Regions:
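Short, conserved catalytic or interaction motifs in soluble domains
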Residues: 35, 54, 64
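Recognition helix of helix-turn-helix/homeodomain-like DNA-binding domains
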Residues: 25-38
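Alpha-helical and His/Cys-centered functional microenvironments
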Residues: 20, 31-32, 55
Length: 72
């Protein structure tokens, strides 16, 4: 699943470790999510979006059959 976590982290001057501690996961989990190698649970996705005070759709881009669906 494509996402903009790295962009939001940069905007808020957070490291992967910082965000991991905030949402209660490991740095490796944040890295895997950013690289699209791990799809977060709905609970974790909401925690990440809430931390940045944005809608979940602004952070995560839903992909169906390899296509990214633009939710804007």
């Amino acid at each position: 699943m494509k996402n903009k976590i790295k962009v939001f982290r940069a905007m808020h001057d957070l490291t992967q470790e910082d965000l991991a501690q905030i949402v209660g996961v490991t740095r490796q989990t944040i890295l895997a999510i950013e690289k699209g190698k791990y799809v977060p649970s709905l609970d974790l996705a909401f925690k990440i979006a809430r931390h940045f005070k944005v809608n979940i759709e602004e952070v995560f881009l839903y992909s169906e059959e390899g296509r990214t669906i633009d939710v804007d």
